[in-house]
Amino acid sequence: MRALVVGGGVAGAASAVALRKVGAEVTVVEAYEEPGGEVGSFLSLAGNGLRALSALGCAEAVAARGFEVPRQRMWGGSGRLLGDVPRGRLSGDPRNSVTLMRGHLVEELRAAAVRAGAEIVTGRRVGPETITAEAAGADLVVGADGIWSVTRRTLAGEAPEPRYAGIYTVSGVSERVPGDVAADPGVFNMVFTRHGAFIHITAPGGEVWWSAQVCSPEEPADTSLESVKELHRLDGAPSAVLGAAVRLHRPTLHHVLAEVPVWQDGRTVLLGDAAHPVGAGQGASMAVEDAVVLARAVREEDSVAAALVRYDRERRARVAKMARAASANRDAKTAGPVGRRVNELIMPIFFRHFYERATGWLYAEDLSEALKAS
């Protein structure tokens, strides 16, 4: 079977590895010459994503490119601790969440794909007028080309288009942050501020990786560091971290996508952000899960068409539930003064008594054995 993968980011590279493991001939076409390296900001891989990477044989190599983050702490704008829970895992899971640069995850997945025998062609942009020619001769076409997916528009002309979600992110790295702020390496700190949420994590070497997620009903005209410093000048830890910034990543506007009604047509299939941008710290993990589930279906079903029907059936409900969780996550960040006060009253109760029950469905997913030979 010949497979064409459109997009060589996390979803595309993971798909290439997974499909090679079940015997497909795989070609990946990627618009950018080098989508790895320092491109993009940092991301987290939760327990479910790391187990999916284990199915690809990549978990250890990927983990080595980042650092473990065992705990997550939520803070109110006043400095009150709202919750202290395991980060991206259930308390009984011995494998900690891993944080790393997005580009380094892509590098590891692409290297694994090449070692497995996939061909990766970079610098080739696929457009609506060229995708048919690119796909000629392929038995399976995988649309892993992100939230602005050309494949999605080609597959279903009436597919929804992304819209701005009312949040943008400015992120970077700080050095020599005051000790009381940077005291605990490996803790994912999320501070709910007057303007959204501010995340900071102290890496093993003492650098602080940070991300300011700022609410703005309209697309912002100014995403500079100075503008973000001004927004957070009264915010304690965020202000201290921003004041020590030494590197910035490219700012990002967050977009949402209404449910895509058509994921596949018997030959072409969407996965990752092309099908369901979820955010909420699960974008990469969900993309890797998609890749593993798709490859398992290809191996076990009698035809590509049957495999794609099964993939759609097995992924829809989980992804829809994740999308609802992501929406609730955004709502917490965009709450007004009254909403923030209510959240500060409710969150300590939730994290103390209900967190594990509420997240068990997400973090307990185990695809680590999904591609083992039967």
Description of each model-found segment:
Residues 1-3, 46-156, 160-175, 215-226, ...:
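Conserved N-terminal helical subregion
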Residues 3-5, 26:
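Conserved hydrophobic helix-helix packing surfaces used for dimerization/oligomerization
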Residues 8-21, 29, 142-143, 248-332:
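Conserved mid-domain beta->alpha element of the FAD-binding
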Residues 11, 34, 148:
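Conserved Rossmann-like nucleotide-cofactor binding loop
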Residues 20-41:
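Glycine-rich FAD pyrophosphate-binding loop
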Residues 64, 79, 279-281, 296-374:
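C-terminal helical "tail/cap" subdomain of flavin- and related membrane-associated enzymes
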Residues 83-86, 90-97, 101-106, 173-251:
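Conserved FAD/dinucleotide-binding core of flavoprotein oxidoreductases
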Residues 149, 169-171, 196-199, 275-276:
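Histidine-centered metal-chelating micro-motifs
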